[in-house]
């Protein structure tokens, strides 16, 4: 009896998942999270982004060293 209940429960869960996948529509066009041509910024390149991240890491490292030197950590 318990095995039949578990099988029916699994089948019901799968039916819900499958029904959700069948009703999904990909034909909605551009949603609110898509990038429009007006929002694209070609001025930013990957090298600049990496350099900004590097500068952030260096500045945080300097702050940590200063705190360790002053005995605050």
Swiss-Prot record:
What does UniProt note about where in the body, tissue by tissue, this protein is expressed?
Expressed in corpora cardiaca (CC), corpora allata (CA) and gnathal ganglion (GNG) (at protein level). Expression in CC and CA detected in all animals, expression in GNG detected in few animals (at protein level). Not expressed in antennal lobe (AL) (at protein level).
The superkingdom of the source organism is Eukaryota
What name is this protein filed under? Adipokinetic prohormone type 2
Q: Which residues carry this modification: Pyrrolidone carboxylic acid?
A: 21
UniProt entry keywords in alphabetical sequence: Amidation, Cleavage on pair of basic residues, Hormone, Neuropeptide, Pyrrolidone carboxylic acid, Secreted, Signal
Function noted in UniProt: This hormone, released from cells in the corpora cardiaca, causes release of diglycerides from the fat body and stimulation of muscles to use these diglycerides as an energy source during energy-demanding processes.
Q: Which family does it belong to?
A: Belongs to the AKH/HRTH/RPCH family.
Under the cellular component aspect of Gene Ontology, which terms does the record hold? Answer: extracellular region
**Where, per the database record, does this protein carry Asparagine amide?**
30
Annotated signal sequence is: 1-20
**Chief site of localization:** secreted
Q: What is the lineage of its organism?
A: Eukaryota, Metazoa, Ecdysozoa, Arthropoda, Hexapoda
Determine if Signal is one of this entry's keywords: yes
Q: Which residues form the propeptide?
A: 34-73
Q: Which GO terms describe its molecular function?
A: hormone activity
One biological process term in Gene Ontology:
neuropeptide signaling pathway
Compartments in which it is found: Secreted
């Amino acid at each position: 009896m318990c095995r039949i209940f578990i099988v029916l429960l699994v089948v019901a869960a799968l039916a819900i998942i499958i029904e959700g996948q069948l009703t999904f529509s990909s034909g909605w066009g551009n949603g609110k999270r898509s990038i429009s041509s007006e929002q694209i910024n070609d001025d930013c390149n990957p090298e600049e982004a990496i350099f900004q991240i590097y500068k952030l890491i260096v500045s945080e490292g300097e702050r940590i060293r200063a705190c360790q030197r002053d005995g605050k950590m």
